[in-house]
Amino acid sequence: MANSRRVEKLAALLKREVSELLVNGIRDERIHQAMITITSVEVSGDLQHAKIFISLFGEEKKKDEVLVGLEEAKGFIRAELAQRLQMRRSPELVFKIDKGMTKGPAVLDLLNALELERKSKDL
């Protein structure tokens, strides 16, 4: 099992390199139909698996196409990562939509409503 510093370093490198690949390395048009942002990367302790959390901005039906494109590009992305990071074995990648990004505005609205309610009770 790798130490936590190595896991964190690999997560940061994966985030940077996958972001670069999404912008410049992948030619699949499905991936470019929505704006993709990598919000975080979680790497397992044995460095064999990586969850890449993404947020997608665009039409709902195009988001599904983007995910299909990412799934099909996984092999290419892993090969590029192995070459760029000079790794004998690159981690298995799993792309997940970051639900926190979509729920954030709703939570802020609830907090603002509670604040207004509290202020009205104080008056």
From Swiss-Prot:
Major subcellular location class: cytoplasm
Gene3D superfamilies on file:
3.30.300.20
- Cell compartments where the protein resides: Cytoplasm
Q: InterPro entries from the xrefs?
A: KH_dom-like_a/b, RbfA, RbfA_dom_sf, Ribosome-bd_factorA_CS
- Which keywords appear in this protein's UniProt record, sorted alphabetically? Cytoplasm, Ribosome biogenesis
Among the GO biological process terms of this entry, one is: maturation of SSU-rRNA
One GO cellular component term noted in the UniProt record for this chain: cytosol
* Record-linked SUPFAM superfamilies: Ribosome-binding factor A, RbfA (SSF89919)
GO molecular function terms noted in the UniProt entry: ribosomal small subunit binding
- Disulfide bonds listed in the record: none
Similarity comment text for this entry: Belongs to the RbfA family.
Against HAMAP family, the record matches this protein to: RbfA (MF_00003)
**Protein name, entry field:** Ribosome-binding factor A
Origin species? Prochlorococcus marinus (strain NATL2A)
Top-level taxonomy: Bacteria, Bacillati, Cyanobacteriota, Cyanophyceae, Synechococcales
Which gene underlies this protein?
A: rbfA
